[in-house]
Amino acid sequence: MSLFKNRKVVFFVTGNVHKFNEARRVLAEYKIPTAMLNLESIEIQDDNLENIARTSATDAAKKSNLPVFVEDAGLFIKALNGFPGPYSSYVYRTLGTKGILKILENEKTRDAYFLSAVAFSNPQEQSEPKTFQGRIEGKIIREEKGTQGFGYDPIFEPLGGNGKAFAEMTTVEKNKYSHRAQALRKFAKWYEGYI
């Protein structure tokens, strides 16, 4: 804990321990102490991830009276005109990775990308939440690979990932490429100057 002496804890509003562990590792690179806050916050339906994250961060900051950040991400598949995009969580819960593979079964073009939006809000300030984005290009592979990670990780292979799906990578490896890690690093660099 001495690494983080005199640093303000920032609270990550999520119920997803996998997301939290990824975020904690990235923010630790910047010596930013992070705590998980499992809090129900508003998640609007919108085609824009930044709007979703911004609304959730504002609501969570008001409810908790703490400086918080939220992260929302989506998988955008080019052959499906960007579907599932901001609805990725719902689609994953209803169709899963096998459903996505079935939909893409006869598609030759399997290009896709993950997009992440991180939003920070401090209830002591009247300003709009600050947002940060990360994006990783890749493709949907033809069958699930690996046992690490969560969500769409077994079917997404990032560009430059040496032919590995996210689910075949350790958290440290995944954080070299991931959309979430990119957005979190942008947030961390900004947050260092903020505190």
Model regions: which residues?
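Anionic-ligand binding patches
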Residues: 2-11, 18-195
